[in-house]
Amino acid sequence: MSGFASKLTSAASGLAAGLFAGRVLSELWAEGNGSTAWWLAFAITLLCILGGIWLFNRFPFRQSWPALLLLIYVFYPEFNLFVAGIAAMLVLLTWWQVNEISLPVPKNLAQIIVPLLLLSFCFLLYFKTLAPDILTADNGEFQLVAANLGVAHPPGFPLYTLLAHLMTRLPFGPIAAFRVNLFSAVTSTLTLAVVYVTIFKLSGRIMPAAAATLILATATTYWAQATTANIRSMTALFAALMFLTLSLFFLEIKKPDPNRANRYLILFALTFGLGVTHHASLAFIGLIAFPFILIMDKSILRSPARWWKPILAFLAGLLPLLYLPLHAYADVRGASPSLATIPGFLEHALATGFRGDLFVYLQPALFMERLRIMINVLTFQFSVGLVLLLALSLFFLAWQEWRLAFLFGGSALLFTLITATYRAPQTVEYMLPAYVALILVLGIGLGGINGRPLPGSNTIWSSLRYLLTALVIVIAISQLASRFDSYSYLNKDYTARDYANSILSEAPQNALLLANWHWATPIWYLQEVENVRPDVEVRYVFPESEPYAETWARRVSEGLADSRDVITTNFDQDAFAALPLSEPLGEAFLFRQEPQSNLPGDFSEEDLALGDAIRIIGYKVDKPEVRLTDEVVLTLAWEPIDSLEDGATLFAHLVAVDGSLAGQQDIAVQTREEGITFTQFRLAPLPGMQPGQYQIMAGAYGLEPYLAADGSPRTAVSTVQINSSDFAPATNNPLQRQLLDGSGHRLAGYDVDNTLSDRSRLYLHWQSADGYSSEVFDNTIPVLPSFSGPWGIPSSRWQFLSRTKPANYVPLGQGIVWTGSSSIPANIEPGQGLTIRHSFLSTAPVLSDQVMSMRLIGFEEDGYHWAWWDLDDSIPGMGAIPTLKWIAGSRVTSPHFVSIDESATLSQEIGGALTLYDAFTGRVLPLLDGRLAAEFGWIPISVRSPAVQ
């Protein structure tokens, strides 16, 4: 490059740096002073440009080119200092590598210090966000069996149980359950250590190893597993150990002395044995590992003498299985004499009861849909950009060393394909070994193989590699920043204990508690580890041959016939219709032998008559303060004044200071012949409600309203304080626009909803010093004050998405937002099957298991009554991504399979109805768009109108 060209390119780097510095300094001025005058921003930027050109002319372009990346923020359309920081970090990390700057310590010491600091940070991160207490479902079971040396569900997980039990013996942490949670943080950190070592051993580079390790550490499900009691963290650890031993075998096999390579084969066999002992799914890695070994060393087939040590090591890895028969007669949870028999042992250790779930989705259409979902599973963990980087890294790795690409990429692909066929309720967790393999592809693909030629020009490849490595670190830091609030929130979540205590503390003496698996395990923990209410008998209600709801109803009837008070965690309105009236017990349901005649002690007394029909004698509000994203739980205690007419309905309202309706629920009621009737309401504040004090009002109606004493249709019961949300509302259009009206408000995003074609709705999401809230505008665009734009210069250019564009944004309870469904072919015929995919966003971690119910409807000629319908209810993502796994910012697409009825006509209007409901209680998730709730009661899905044929 000529001297003039060199100066010109260096000046370009200086210009980029100057523009960036000028913009950031101007915006920092605006941050402290409200805004920056255009002339001041111009002067600051001009000085920075001159200084940048002068400074960068001292460096050749091959050293200064990373500064051009600062143009990312120079042209970024919003004032956002976080994005500026990300751009600056990207440049510094790239520049650090381009100029081969060393840490101010000896190289050998740096190779120790960097991973130690990284791993210490990750462990402290997990400790800071660790689940604090008992957990539900499998997590709760693992806490219980670890504390009492019990036997977990098949395959039993004996090695995990023993190691977690040792953890419970350590003298720190408040309770055993906490220490079992901490064990996951330990195993997850060890997995990160193994991943780092594997990448570093193969690439010899610190930064790619650290970048890839941090990506895995902050992946959604990996972080979740690192902070809760589970067996998946150990599954990931054994997968990582297998990959490490095979990588070391790869490095040693070509050396003159084969003994070290043989030792790594023995270590692989041991970890493989321990791995499949822990979880049989790791055997699938063997389908790739064994061909890899043969590819690397074909002579092993001709050397049987080399087999026996690996075989013995593998058999040694199976020794933990002896725990099962040795505990067959122990008086602990899960133990059974059948474990001491060969058939019983094999059935448990091999988990043969789950064999019907494997290879379920092999039918081509279902399998292709599952592959779509597997892509969503990956984007649930990593950003779309990172998933593309994974594919690019696999290409780089295959170019340099196809055998390693076969090992890591093949393992990830095989595990993904097999998981896609598996009817697993939590596919995001089953995929952990695949995430480990993919991260190894990422780190080694970017870091390169020590001593191997690189594709293309070394200079071009090196520059690209440096840039992509820096980009991975920036993505990892962004993942950390975006997900920390969710896991910090879960660190304060005591839902399982609160639920279990609400039942056990109020349960009648010697009651029978019928529980689903989700709630049975934490209740068992309280009883068996903390000795809470051992008089209450807890029975897990497992599925039988009949419909599950009918099993519950039968079990309740049997308990009542046995003269016992019965509590259930599940409720089904149709199946329970013939049972006596229940009363709420926390979130559970109590069927009493004798009706309640006295008001419970935690209720406030009241005497409110609603017409000549109902007298409210007391109430309970669960919490005096909630957030905008929480539900207000109100329980009314009442008695009939006279016999109630059919269809009598109680309602509860949340009412703002100005009298506007902030939340509502109507419940058709039944009454007892004797005693008090209890009705529980869950009031979700509607979007647009602002923080403040709200009244809780109640009323009732039949054919006419039941008027209160003052003649009004509703009467005040209590008040509740509603505070701003701690989480930014989920949005398709994030912004950071600081208003200049002195309010301190910042627009955090906006969304447009055109679900109703003739009634557009605009949501504005605001951030203030107290938290987040939203405003709602129907068929209008508000006039807003000026805001601080790029360079901190005041701007009034408010531009929102066209309100005529197809856009959907329908908030539901618990922070879930429906953002639309896939388009339907215009030409649909009778009998045709349809796949309708719904998209969702999450504002905050979801703490309930929601079922998505999609109903396809053929309307009669009046466009109102139904001629036919088809229903598909499923857990999101065909069970792959349950709502219990969602955190703030999660994006999930869920397919539903419905069919056009054979009786449908070409001119018939066809539509759809989408609702979400609790998998256990059947409670419908509140629809927080008052227009849709009043007109439909569900989210209407447009499929075909008579005009479209």
Where are the predicted features?
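Short acidic/glycine- and proline-prone juxtamembrane loop motifs at membrane-interface regions
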Residues: 224-232
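Transmembrane-helix motifs of polytopic, lipid-linked glycan transferases
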Residues: 48-56, 182-203, 241-245, 392, ...
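Transmembrane-helix signature of polytopic, membrane-embedded enzymes
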Residues: 56-68, 195-218, 237, 257-260, ...
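C-terminal luminal/periplasmic domains and tails of membrane-associated envelope-modifying transferases
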Residues: 501-515, 521-524, 530-949
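Membrane-interface transmembrane helices that cradle and orient dolichyl/undecaprenyl
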Residues: 52-63, 200-203, 242-268, 272-275, ...
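Signature aromatic-anchored transmembrane alpha helix within multi-pass, membrane-resident enzymes
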Residues: 13-20, 398-401, 444-482
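Perimembrane helix-loop-helix junctions
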Residues: 91-102, 250-251, 256, 284-315
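Hydrophobic, aromatic-rich transmembrane alpha-helices
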Residues: 49-54, 379-402
